[in-house]
Amino acid sequence: MISLPGLTIAAGRPEWAGKIIRTFAQYLDQGMLPNVFPEVGEKPEYNTVDAILWYFEAIRAYYAATEDQTLIRQIFPALVDVIEWHQRGTRYNIHLDEDGLLYAGVPGAQLTWMDAKIGDWVVTPRMGKPIEINALWYNALQIMAQLAQVVGQPQEDYIRLATQTHRGFQRYWQQEKGYCVDVLDGPEGDDDSLRPNQIFAVALPYGDLAGPPLLSAQQQQAVVDTCSRSLLTSYGLRSLAPDHPDYQGSYGGDSLQRDSVYHQGTTWGWLIGPFVQAHLRVYQDSDQALSFLQPMADHLHNHSMGSLSEIFEGNAPFRPRGCIAQAWTVAEVLRVWQVLQRHTHHSSPSPLIR
């Protein structure tokens, strides 16, 4: 779902996006999408909290590109069901808490994109209320309010839920540190590790839709500046700040060694997309935002044959690691490049169509 807007819509193939959205709708179950599709005779696996939330963003991007009301009318009842499942609770203790924030997780499960697991060891446990999950949830509620308007259905419930989430989201902000908590209400309390997930609280388009941004303008700038100082490398954002005691800046060794550092300092290429979009939103400087993509262009020509790598080491010279052709990375570079092109030419359609 993260890759869908970039690999289809930004690449000039929105009809593919529509087909994929329809196909995935057939696999919705208890308000969730599978992260592993079945082989013949097997069942899909549902162990991700964010896939369904990225599905909403993919739908928003598709409608922005096509204004295909037919598809929206077909899938809208299923989207209503998704929201209701999250309100009452679904697998893995995923549920909407009283503070308006989504809680997700049970011991031994890895439900976010930071999903490395070795045997029974979850390397990056994020049980609780991960920040990007709640930024995505707020985004989904704003999208639902807009889509309800498209199909002529009431939007008040989604606006009410979004207002609750906005209020609860203020708990993430740490004034004394100038950045956001990564996970609230975990088994051992809040996790204030400096990780890149907070960039989605600035980058996602919810502020352009029905409700206010989750963070103030000053807070957004602080998040972007903090990520620039501590997480930004030539090819993306580090998964953990270098001054954290668990930081690992090199990636190598056997599978155990590699998985143990996968999200503990390794640079992820796909995160360059939300970072560039967040930077553009805060500073409105398309030339500077575009400059962040230049190393990826160099990498495209000098390292891989027509594609972009999955990850890079957290320490200079940021050697490429992982798979040499990663859909997330390619998709996010394409998507944010298109965003920059539109910004440069000042083509700004209606709020939902961005």
Regions of interest found by a model, annotated:
Residues 316-354:
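In a subset of proteins, long, contiguous C-terminal domains/tails are tracked
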Residues 15-16, 71, 78, 154-157, ...:
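Alpha-helical positions within canonical tetratricopeptide repeat
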Residues 34-35, 87, 91-98, 138-251, ...:
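Catalytic cores of carbohydrate-active enzymes
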Residues 106-123:
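Acidic/polar loop-and-plug regions of large Gram-negative outer-membrane beta-barrel proteins
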Residues 4-111, 130-134, 138, 266-280, ...:
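Aromatic-rich carbohydrate-recognition surfaces in CAZymes
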Residues 11, 63, 145, 149-152, ...:
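Short coil/turn linking the two alpha-helices of tandem helical-hairpin repeats
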Residues 1, 39-52, 119-135, 182-212, ...:
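Solvent-exposed loop and edge beta-strand segments that line ligand/cofactor-binding
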